[in-house]
Design a protein with these regions (language model features):
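Core AdoMet radical
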Residues: 1-27, 39-43, 67-69
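Auxiliary Fe-S-binding modules of radical SAM enzymes
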Residues: 25-37, 44-131
């Protein structure tokens, strides 16, 4: 089951006014504690630092999250939160490497990744694990 964190702790109140960072972590924790594979996704390019992304990864791992997707935030319209930066492919690769080193089973990290990116591959991974 996926519950997207969307962004790092500092930026959450700016882009998710109806959601709290800690509440989202608790949702992930409850999913994982139920024995269900927990997945989350975040957008980068909102002004976060790599250190904040790593802190978010640590929080997700402590909550039991096993799959992480990381994609570039794209401003849907001029009324929405602006893009602070376009993250480089090298930084996306670094996020993937860091996430795997932190213990995520799977990390998809690239500019056009969305939370459903390669979902069929993720399902197949866990089907193999349960046989």
């Amino acid at each position: 089951i996926s519950h997207n964190m969307e962004t790092v702790k500092r930026i959450t109140p700016l882009v998710r006014s109806a959601a709290r960072y800690e509440t989202s972590l608790e949702v992930i924790r409850q999913i994982a504690d139920s024995g269900i594979t927990a997945k989350s996704g975040i957008m980068v390019g909102l002004g976060e630092t790599p250190e904040e992304v790593e802190e978010l990864m640590d929080d997700l791992r402590r909550a039991g999250c096993q799959i992480l997707t990381i994609g570039q935030y794209l401003q849907p319209s001029h009324k929405h939160y602006p893009v602070a930066e376009y993250v480089t492919p090298a930084q996306f690769a670094s996020y993937k490497e860091t996430g795997l080193a932190k213990g995520f089973d799977q990390v998809e990290s690239a500019p056009l990744v969305r939370s459903s990116y390669h979902a069929e591959k993720q399902v197949q991974f866990y089907k193999k694990e349960t046989k």
